[in-house]
């Protein structure tokens, strides 16, 4: 989750989010390099009192400033297309959960395990424990095993919502009358927080999501208590 004074993106907890982080870092360096080069060229021409007569008409320079951006865009686009493919790639998931967005809480269904169902509401500030997170904790956490491919089926019962967990690189629109899906794999244990990412009314800011990544044994024990 995002922590105090952290100005960067969250640490990835899934292979997909790690790839997105690498993509962000690489292309941030490209953007900084372009900014420095263009800024230096503009400053040099602005404060230079001399005129190069050979530069008054487009010759070699026009070819250069057309070819270099084109090559740069190609190197940026290729990793981006690969990530877009991975984001939409659908694999054979071992566990499927259903999330239904409602005003203003989430409903979950584990239909693979005798229809385990529950609702999650934000924990009020007066009910938080000492180690709780304000506006992020819920009364029922969503427990999932790590190192397991999980498929999320998302819909809504009233208005548009969006099920988003940044640390997992997942953002799925919840649309009434439609069923959207996404997949992810958590590669480490922990608590991963998210929120509704589509403005859905007065209490839009109070629809947190909490995913608890555990071992398979602890997940089975939790399921046995829920059934």
From Swiss-Prot:
<keyword id="KW-0496">Mitochondrion</keyword>
<feature type="binding site">
    <location>
        <position position="198"/>
    </location>
    <ligand>
        <name>Mg(2+)</name>
    </ligand>
</feature>
<keyword id="KW-0460">Magnesium</keyword>
<dbReference type="GO" id="GO:0004129">
    <property type="term" value="F:cytochrome-c oxidase activity"/>
</dbReference>
<keyword id="KW-0186">Copper</keyword>
<keyword id="KW-1278">Translocase</keyword>
<dbReference type="InterPro" id="IPR008972">
    <property type="entry name" value="Cupredoxin"/>
</dbReference>
<keyword id="KW-0813">Transport</keyword>
<comment type="subunit">
    <text>Component of the cytochrome c oxidase (complex IV, CIV), a multisubunit enzyme composed of a catalytic core of 3 subunits and several supernumerary subunits. The complex exists as a monomer or a dimer and forms supercomplexes (SCs) in the inner mitochondrial membrane with ubiquinol-cytochrome c oxidoreductase (cytochrome b-c1 complex, complex III, CIII).</text>
</comment>
<comment type="function">
    <text>Component of the cytochrome c oxidase, the last enzyme in the mitochondrial electron transport chain which drives oxidative phosphorylation. The respiratory chain contains 3 multisubunit complexes succinate dehydrogenase (complex II, CII), ubiquinol-cytochrome c oxidoreductase (cytochrome b-c1 complex, complex III, CIII) and cytochrome c oxidase (complex IV, CIV), that cooperate to transfer electrons derived from NADH and succinate to molecular oxygen, creating an electrochemical gradient over the inner membrane that drives transmembrane transport and the ATP synthase.</text>
</comment>
<dbReference type="InterPro" id="IPR011759">
    <property type="entry name" value="Cyt_c_oxidase_su2_TM_dom"/>
</dbReference>
<feature type="binding site">
    <location>
        <position position="200"/>
    </location>
    <ligand>
        <name>Cu cation A2</name>
    </ligand>
</feature>
<feature type="binding site">
    <location>
        <position position="196"/>
    </location>
    <ligand>
        <name>Cu cation A2</name>
    </ligand>
</feature>
<dbReference type="GO" id="GO:0042773">
    <property type="term" value="P:ATP synthesis coupled electron transport"/>
</dbReference>
<dbReference type="InterPro" id="IPR045187">
    <property type="entry name" value="CcO_II"/>
</dbReference>
<feature type="transmembrane region" description="Helical">
    <location>
        <begin position="63"/>
        <end position="82"/>
    </location>
</feature>
<feature type="binding site">
    <location>
        <position position="200"/>
    </location>
    <ligand>
        <name>Cu cation A1</name>
    </ligand>
</feature>
<dbReference type="InterPro" id="IPR034210">
    <property type="entry name" value="CcO_II_C"/>
</dbReference>
<keyword id="KW-0479">Metal-binding</keyword>
<keyword id="KW-0679">Respiratory chain</keyword>
<keyword id="KW-0472">Membrane</keyword>
<feature type="binding site">
    <location>
        <position position="204"/>
    </location>
    <ligand>
        <name>Cu cation A2</name>
    </ligand>
</feature>
<keyword id="KW-0249">Electron transport</keyword>
<comment type="similarity">
    <text>Belongs to the cytochrome c oxidase subunit 2 family.</text>
</comment>
<feature type="topological domain" description="Mitochondrial intermembrane">
    <location>
        <begin position="83"/>
        <end position="227"/>
    </location>
</feature>
<protein>
    <recommendedName>
        <fullName>Cytochrome c oxidase subunit 2</fullName>
        <ecNumber>7.1.1.9</ecNumber>
    </recommendedName>
</protein>
<dbReference type="InterPro" id="IPR001505">
    <property type="entry name" value="Copper_CuA"/>
</dbReference>
<feature type="topological domain" description="Mitochondrial matrix">
    <location>
        <begin position="49"/>
        <end position="62"/>
    </location>
</feature>
<feature type="topological domain" description="Mitochondrial intermembrane">
    <location>
        <begin position="1"/>
        <end position="26"/>
    </location>
</feature>
<dbReference type="InterPro" id="IPR002429">
    <property type="entry name" value="CcO_II-like_C"/>
</dbReference>
<keyword id="KW-0812">Transmembrane</keyword>
<feature type="binding site">
    <location>
        <position position="207"/>
    </location>
    <ligand>
        <name>Cu cation A1</name>
    </ligand>
</feature>
<dbReference type="InterPro" id="IPR036257">
    <property type="entry name" value="Cyt_c_oxidase_su2_TM_sf"/>
</dbReference>
<feature type="binding site">
    <location>
        <position position="196"/>
    </location>
    <ligand>
        <name>Cu cation A1</name>
    </ligand>
</feature>
<dbReference type="GO" id="GO:0005743">
    <property type="term" value="C:mitochondrial inner membrane"/>
</dbReference>
<dbReference type="GO" id="GO:0005507">
    <property type="term" value="F:copper ion binding"/>
</dbReference>
<dbReference type="Pfam" id="PF00116">
    <property type="entry name" value="COX2"/>
</dbReference>
<keyword id="KW-0999">Mitochondrion inner membrane</keyword>
<dbReference type="Pfam" id="PF02790">
    <property type="entry name" value="COX2_TM"/>
</dbReference>
<feature type="binding site">
    <location>
        <position position="161"/>
    </location>
    <ligand>
        <name>Cu cation A1</name>
    </ligand>
</feature>
<feature type="binding site">
    <location>
        <position position="198"/>
    </location>
    <ligand>
        <name>Cu cation A2</name>
    </ligand>
</feature>
<keyword id="KW-1133">Transmembrane helix</keyword>
């Amino acid at each position: 989750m995002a922590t105090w004074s952290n100005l960067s993106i969250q640490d990835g907890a899934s292979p997909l989010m790690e790839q997105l982080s690498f993509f962000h870092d690489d292309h941030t360096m490209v953007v900084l390099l372009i900014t420095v080069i263009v800024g230096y060229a503009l400053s040099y021409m602005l404060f230079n009192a001399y005129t190069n007569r050979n530069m008054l008409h487009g010759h070699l320079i026009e070819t250069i400033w057309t070819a270099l951006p084109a090559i740069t865009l190609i190197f940026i686009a290729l990793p981006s297309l690969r990530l877009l493919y991975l984001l939409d790639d659908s694999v054979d998931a071992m566990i499927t959960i259903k999330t239904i967005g409602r005003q203003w809480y989430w409903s979950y269904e584990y239909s693979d395990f005798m229809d385990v169902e529950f609702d999650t509401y934000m924990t009020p500030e007066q009910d938080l424990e000492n180690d709780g997170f304000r506006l992020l904790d819920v009364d029922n956490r969503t427990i999932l095993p790590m190192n397991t491919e999980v498929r999320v089926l998302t819909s809504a019962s009233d208005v548009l919502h969006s099920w988003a967990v940044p640390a997992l690189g997942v953002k799925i629109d919840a649309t009434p009358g439609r069923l959207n899906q996404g997949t992810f794999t958590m590669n480490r244990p922990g608590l991963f927080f998210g929120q509704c990412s589509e403005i859905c009314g007065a209490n839009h800011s109070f629809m947190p999501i909490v995913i608890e990544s555990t071992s398979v044994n602890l997940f089975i024990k939790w399921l046995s208590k829920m059934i």
